[in-house]
């Protein structure tokens, strides 16, 4: 086993001093965090949208998107609450490909994780301070959470990480909403065991110290579809899937039951335009069944400035990872959600 150090040990306090929220910007973030918590707890009946690019590969494109989203948020704020996806670390099935801003702060240059950490904080800071949007990120590397936990408002534990004990235990110490995706197998027990672990106190080693957490009552479920043994996607946003998920929630007696539908990934088969239909179908299911309306109160939507995806970062605001809805389709979908909720 050989590890070669490529930098001095990172000083967490020094990193956190960069791009620090203060004054009115901090106050605005804390206010929005309180609103988000009320939504997860069921005290606020607005629909939650965790929405934005699959990956945040270009700072200026992400900022342009954030400013448009902020304007739209103001128009729909009485029925819809949006947290912007600013995903800076991407899981790769075989380790190849673009791994996110934290690895590669410039998608056209060689990886540099030290500069990547600074870029991640700077981007979250700019979205919050310049656009007024609070942000979501994926906890791909649990040990990196202290580098950004003062900036983010929502955290997702992905399908490949949900069974990992370290991810579950670190999530139990987070003081913000944390969504657990079902694994790629579709096994709901794995997801619910993760939520249970995160909602309870845990003791473990973290960053070289023995720590104890309080438990995170804002941990909840994200349904993202599954893959069968032949690699075919199996959606799990259908009516029966939702009723099964609700039954499991009720059986386990978890706090603050809350279900988000991930409209892309294996629910859409990465056919990005399918996200629109999945939202529509879920809203119909909410109308049909009061339990679904009570439990299913959020969507995760992948969108950017331009429709689709590209292999290289050539078109401004077009994804270089999974395909996304472009801005025109995004705006139309959010307005449609808003109108449907008012009917």
Predicted regions: what they are:
Residues 37-45, 251-256:
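Glycine-rich phosphate/diphosphate-binding loops that line cofactor/substrate pockets in enzymes
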Residues 52, 261, 326:
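Conserved, mostly hydrophobic/aromatic
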Residues 66, 79-244, 265-270, 274-281, ...:
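Active-site-facing alpha/beta catalytic cores
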Residues 245-250:
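Redox- and metal-dependent alpha/beta enzyme cores, enriched for Fe-S-associated oxidoreductases
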Residues 303-341:
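Internal helix-turn-beta structural module
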């Amino acid at each position: 086993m050989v590890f070669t150090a490529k930098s001095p040990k990172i000083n967490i306090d020094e990193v956190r001093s960069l791009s620090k929220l203060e004054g009115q910007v901090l106050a605005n973030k804390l206010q929005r965090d309180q609103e988000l918590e009320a939504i997860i707890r069921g005290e606020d009946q607005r629909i939650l949208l965790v929405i934005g690019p699959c990956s945040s590969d270009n700072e200026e494109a992400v900022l342009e998107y954030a400013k448009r989203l902020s304007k739209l948020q103001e128009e729909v704020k009485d029925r819809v609450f949006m947290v912007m996806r600013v995903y800076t670390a991407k899981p790769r099935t075989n380790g190849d490909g673009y791994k996110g801003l934290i690895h590669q702060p410039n998608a056209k240059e060689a990886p540099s994780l030290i500069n990547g950490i600074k870029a991640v904080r700077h981007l979250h800071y700019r979205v919050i301070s310049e656009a007024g949007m609070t942000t979501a990120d994926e906890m791909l590397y649990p040990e990196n959470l202290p580098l950004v936990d003062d900036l983010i408002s929502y955290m997702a534990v992905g399908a490949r990480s949900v069974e990992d004990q370290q991810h579950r235990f670190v999530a139990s110490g987070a003081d913000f909403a944390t969504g657990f995706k079902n694994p790629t197998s579709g096994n709901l027990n794995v997801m619910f065991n993760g939520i249970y672990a995160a909602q309870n106190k845990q003791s473990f080693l973290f960053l070289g110290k023995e720590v104890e957490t309080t438990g995170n009552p804002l941990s909840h479920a994200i349904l993202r579809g599954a893959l069968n043994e032949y690699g075919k996607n199996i959606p799990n946003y259908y009516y029966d899937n939702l009723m099964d998920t609700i039954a499991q929630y009720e059986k386990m007696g978890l706090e603050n039951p809350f279900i988000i539908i991930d409209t892309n990934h294996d629910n859409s088969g990465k056919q990005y335009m399918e996200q629109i239909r999945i939202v529509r179908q879920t809203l119909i299911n909410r109308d049909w069944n009061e339990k679904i309306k009570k439990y299913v109160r959020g969507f995760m939507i992948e969108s950017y400035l331009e429709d689709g995806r590209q292999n290289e970062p050539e078109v401004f605001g077009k994804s270089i990872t999974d395909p996304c809805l472009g801005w025109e389709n995004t705006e139309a979908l959010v307005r449609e959600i808003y109108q449907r909720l008012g009917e």
